[in-house]
């Protein structure tokens, strides 16, 4: 096989490289082009579609194109945040794959000059009855916990689903959030002819070589041969690197800073050069090596972790090096900025590579791949009337997709740094205090591939609205979103069709909800053999609560005697709900349409209701439907529920539909009249469901008939134990 094909390049791509250079590249140059032209680094199949997403908003300080997006939260402060995938490595080596995914996203945040304050993770696995899936799940969770806990950054939120489509290809999407003084915001740019280029942090080894290429192809049935492509992480080294970088930034005289992630020194140098429109000359014999005999090819493509590339003002390099030495870290001048337009690489006095930075970045191919919009056909109907509502509630509460994820977050230190206001499991989103202010931020990841698979456009709209509602029910105003788009092979028209429709759905949702996209990540080739994952857009979002004392809305029911209301109009569709899957299997029932306008009104209304003192709690209706959401609010508040309502829907439809855009709120009886007036003035549909009681029970009567009467303590035991039981 031709060398370029082994590296992941097509014949046409190789021809383009030769034509651009006017010569054949040598091995080092070919390797550099191959990693930078990989799907993982170049976004060559997705770029033309990603440009359709709205990226501007009043709070946006930094949009796509940098290490992370940044939004303004006032007081001269910004929030830097980004989500990225580490799917392929985690399928081969779950602990290290997940751990290094966390490490990489943390470096993206502090490269902006921000101090990381929180981690989130969005995970997808096959069904837990498979020993391999249990191995992957426990390994990934341990890897995230091991890295995050050691570095001292709390893992505060996330989401986990278990569905057949992720059997061979798990998804590990990690998000990091950091806080930055906007006046000290730093970018990954290389400028200033003669300025030195420093490589700081860990030594360079052979781990992760061609990791970016590995992430740009389908997994084989036996991925063991790819184990060397998985990087190895050292969280203690990363902690030192984090503190040293922030201290160096505080000292000043740093022009730009970039993480060495996918494609290692090749990508960090070429991306910094492209942003600064400058050349860079590198001397590889100065690079501190972990292993003897490493070639220039290996040094340029190594993805060894815990390394950063810095451009420093000439004359200040010795002071910067002293800072890193104080933290017991390597810091070496490995090059300088030139007035050319090339990345020049020297080794033992010989030029081993000389490539225009444009060839590695903006000249990478961009494909408008053929696509076929998925047909939504052979739709079926079901009659759920025969399903006992009490039995359904019990089964759903202990389903691994709904049951409390105590097994996961009890391994994470979610309190380290003492910024966490609400613990995992007690809110729809994590809430973090911004020290020195009254403010808080709410952060969340969300997405549901099964809905997207059955209707990519509506499913994508659902993912955006669901995440925004998760913030709004805490009292937060959404400021911006990042996304991780996980799909199969883009060379297949049906997969590309899913992607195009998802982008269209996200675009519509972001525009109507006024939430700009600040960046993200695309992960293609999540496919083994002919089996692709569900198309899975994962949305990460950040929102602002102006005053935690007066603006924070709890999820838990607060007071016996409070009235329970539903915001939004229930329509009863069961398409792709957990109820449908549990009792009817894979039935092609239509996905409920998403009412973005109603969702927007509710998102804007909730913080106002709290500020007016008109609601005591709020919780959005999500997985499992209204019945499960009522239980979750009751469990959190240790209070019972009485529902007495008349509806034209079947009880099963009313209680277990997962229509997005419904929110349960509790209201003091003396505030009821004012509450209803405010809600109706906002144009939001509202229904009175019942009231909070002090008993150990949930009682639901519909149309004069009791359909559920259960002890809350027994239901809570199912909810608390479901995931642990599934792992046994």
Swiss-Prot record:
Catalytic activity line of the entry: N(2)-formyl-N(1)-(5-phospho-beta-D-ribosyl)glycinamide + L-glutamine + ATP + H2O = 2-formamido-N(1)-(5-O-phospho-beta-D-ribosyl)acetamidine + L-glutamate + ADP + phosphate + H(+)
Keyword Ligase: yes
Residues the entry annotates as binding substrate: 85-88, 107, 231, 303-305, 523
Single Gene Ontology BP annotation: 'de novo' IMP biosynthetic process
UniProt GO molecular function: ATP binding; magnesium ion binding; phosphoribosylformylglycinamidine synthase activity
Enzyme class at the top of the EC tree: ligase
Residues annotated for ATP binding in this entry: 43, 82, 483, 520
EC code(s) of this entry: 6.3.5.3
Protein location: Cytoplasm
GO annotations of cellular component type: cytoplasm
Binding site for Mg(2+) 2: 108, 259
Pfam families cross-referenced by the UniProt entry: AIRS, AIRS_C, FGAR-AT_linker
Active-site residue list: 40, 86 (proton acceptor)
CDD domains named in the record: PurL_repeat1 (cd02203), PurL_repeat2 (cd02204)
Amino-acid positions noted as binding Mg(2+) 1 in the UniProt annotation, renumbered to this chain: 84, 521
Entry keywords, A to Z: ATP-binding, Cytoplasm, Ligase, Magnesium, Metal-binding, Nucleotide-binding, Purine biosynthesis
Biological pathway: Purine metabolism; IMP biosynthesis via de novo pathway; 5-amino-1-(5-phospho-D-ribosyl)imidazole from N(2)-formyl-N(1)-(5-phospho-D-ribosyl)glycinamide: step 1/2
Record function comment: Part of the phosphoribosylformylglycinamidine synthase complex involved in the purines biosynthetic pathway. Catalyzes the ATP-dependent conversion of formylglycinamide ribonucleotide (FGAR) and glutamine to yield formylglycinamidine ribonucleotide (FGAM) and glutamate. The FGAM synthase complex is composed of three subunits. PurQ produces an ammonia molecule by converting glutamine to glutamate. PurL transfers the ammonia molecule to FGAR to form FGAM in an ATP-dependent manner.
Similarity annotation: Belongs to the FGAMS family.
HAMAP family: PurL_2 (MF_00420)
Record note on quaternary structure: Monomer. Part of the FGAM synthase complex composed of 1 PurL, 1 PurQ and 2 PurS subunits.
NCBIfam families (UniProt xref): FGAM_synth_II, PRK01213.1
UniProt-recorded name of the protein: Phosphoribosylformylglycinamidine synthase subunit PurL
Organism encoding this protein: Carboxydothermus hydrogenoformans (strain ATCC BAA-161 / DSM 6008 / Z-2901)
